[in-house]
């Protein structure tokens, strides 16, 4: 069969980029070929969600000789689409072994007032001649398909379908967050997943818009208007709510302390309110509530927890941060480091957590 008489599978889903130059047909009256080639090989990863037909196609092992002009005429007459004997009320005979094709043809032939894709996915049980086709189990099995297995129209999901109510593809429901018709009517899990993801992206976009006006408390520039991408980040302090750009707060904390200067009170404290913060969290967003700040900090720690610590070095090195390190302490066999804290009781009754104690620390304090 010529490719010009085979309906383009990309055109069926509204995604053909070749237009009039496509070698396949863009006429809905032509026969489609929606057999999944991956299913024939037994390796379709989409399963029931695949938009193509999962049917076994029998192959003739013998190779036919090149057809002549006379045999071509006989072959074309013998390759007419099959029908299972239903009355020709549609005006097109579809392949009975292709249930999705039967659905598409009936959807195209429907001329009711409601949208075509809103019709049921079965033929009418009683036709004009009074024959009840619903009593035939063979016909019913061949024409019944779960609506959840059908894809939605990509044109409608993108915002505008040129076919409107006459579109042969199913139209999705409206997502109130993104404003697109992209919610599948018969896939509740997929709808819920899209809604959560869409709300999360919308919330992030709103936070990004509000963060555009935040200025650094040191250089007084808008943080997200810095010239380079590396500078367009906030440096969040764990115990303070003053905004800083990441470069300014890091330069402040990396200054070498003078003799006799307390590092905690001089460098690790906020330049404005002097509150002590032991670490800085880089972020492209600024928070506007305590919950948002905790979410940013938790996401940052979770990301670092998946990165191996360069000081621990899979157990061959020593991390100076100990149990306070945000990075992963794991051995080469995948085992995580078992943290055992040593508690020391002081004379005043307080308890402190001891770090690694070495003999050289005591010997260095002796004046012999």
Curated annotation (Swiss-Prot):
**Region feature (Disordered):** 58-81
Q: In which pathway does it act?
A: Protein modification; protein ubiquitination
Family annotation (SUPFAM superfamilies): CCCH zinc finger, RING/U-box
Q: What is its EC number?
A: 2.3.2.27
Name of the protein this chain belongs to: E3 ubiquitin-protein ligase makorin
To which species is this protein native? Oryza sativa subsp. japonica (Rice)
Enzyme class at the top of the EC tree: transferase
Q: Which SMART domains did the record assign? A: RING, ZnF_C3H1
Give one GO molecular function term: zinc ion binding
Q: Which domain of life is it from?
A: Eukaryota
């Amino acid at each position: 069969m010529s490719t010009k008489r085979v309906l383009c599978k990309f055109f069926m889903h509204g995604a053909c980029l070749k237009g009039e130059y496509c070698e396949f047909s863009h006429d809905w009256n032509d026969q489609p070929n929606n057999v999944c080639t991956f299913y024939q090989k037994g390796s379709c990863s989409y399963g029931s969600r695949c938009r193509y037909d999962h049917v076994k196609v029998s192959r003739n092992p013998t190779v036919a000789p090149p057809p002549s002009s006379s045999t071509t005429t006989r072959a074309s007459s013998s390759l007419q689409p099959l029908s299972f004997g239903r009355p020709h009320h549609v005006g097109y005979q579809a392949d009975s072994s292709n249930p999705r094709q039967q659905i598409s043809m009936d959807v195209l032939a429907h001329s009711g007032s409601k949208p075509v894709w809103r019709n049921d996915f079965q033929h009418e049980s009683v036709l004009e001649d009074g024959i009840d086709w619903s009593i035939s189990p063979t016909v019913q099995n061949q024409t019944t398909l779960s609506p959840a297995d059908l894809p939605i129209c990509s044109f409608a999901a993108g915002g505008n379908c040129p076919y409107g109510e006459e579109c042969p593809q199913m139209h999705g429901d409206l997502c109130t967050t993104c404003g697109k018709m992209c919610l599948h009517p018969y896939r509740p899990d997929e709808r819920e997943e899209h809604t959560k993801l869409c709300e999360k992206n919308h919330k992030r976009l709103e936070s990004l818009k509000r963060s555009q006006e935040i200025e650094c408390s040191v250089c007084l520039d808008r943080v997200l208007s810095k010239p380079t991408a590396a500078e367009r980040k906030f440096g969040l302090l764990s115990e303070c709510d003053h905004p800083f750009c990441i470069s300014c707060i890091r330069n402040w904390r990396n200054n070498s302390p003078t003799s006799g200067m307390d590092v905690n009170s001089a460098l690790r404290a906020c330049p404005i309110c002097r509150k002590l913060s032991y670490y800085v969290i880089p972020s492209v967003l600024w928070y506007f509530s305590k919950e948002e700040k905790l979410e940013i900090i938790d996401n940052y720690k979770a990301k670092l927890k998946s990165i191996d610590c360069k000081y621990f070095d899979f157990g061959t090195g020593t991390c100076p941060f100990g149990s306070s390190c945000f990075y992963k302490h794991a051995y080469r066999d995948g085992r995580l480091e078992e943290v055992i804290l040593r508690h020391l009781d002081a004379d005043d009754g307080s308890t402190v957590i001891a770090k690694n104690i070495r003999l050289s620390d005591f010997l260095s304090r002796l004046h012999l």
